[in-house]
Amino acid sequence: FNIFHWHLCDDQGWRIESEKYPLLNEKGSWRDCHGFGSPNMERYGGYFTKDEIRDVIKFCEDRFIEVVPEIDMPGHTTAIVSTFPELSCRGVQIPLETTGGIFKNILCAGNEAVFDFCFGILDEVMELFPCKYIHIGGDEAPKARWCNCEKCQQRIKDEHLNNVEELQGYFANRIIAYLKSKGKEVLAWNESLNSGILDDDCIICDWMDRTHKSEAYANEGGRII
């Protein structure tokens, strides 16, 4: 109970200040209306400034609570691809989502600019959060766009992968390798195991009631929450 896992972005909004990518706050932190509960037509959004986040971290540290940030990828990224359409497979402008769900416009795993973006964002996160852990999401990433994306299909060929599930494993492993090079330990949701090639140093957060792959991962020495 002394860990605060802070989910900082999703399809409905980007909630952390970025000095490197200010458009994320100008555009990605705001949606046209609030579709949860009692919908209204008012613009909804906002984000935590870096100073506000530092205040939260200090508040938690004083109470022996460690703050673990999560930047979800490659799915649940509508706030990103609506701000930067060129980071999606189709490059088409889309709005932020206003309801809950699983949405098919995700980061393009065949586009090298996507990795540059992710590394840039994670650099900002690491500068802000002293925690040794970073959560990279990995849940609920539908692959329909990847199946029909020339760049993603070319990446599969170039990296000698077998399918789009392995492409997500490739995506995760590049992010994990980058974070490990910075001295961080990486967490991800249990769907990340579906690729069968995930870095076995990754700590899996199983939110789906002890899935078979998670049990097998644990039995092979993997770390599971």
PLM feature spans:
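Internal hydrophobic scaffold segments of catalytic domains
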Residues: 1-9, 66-70, 214, 220, ...
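An active-site-proximal structural segment forming one wall of the substrate-binding cleft
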Residues: 1-4, 53-74, 105-137
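Aromatic- and acidic-residue-enriched carbohydrate-binding clefts of CAZyme catalytic domains
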Residues: 10-62, 77-116, 144-169
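Conserved helix-loop functional segments at active or binding sites
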Residues: 26-33, 123-127, 131, 195
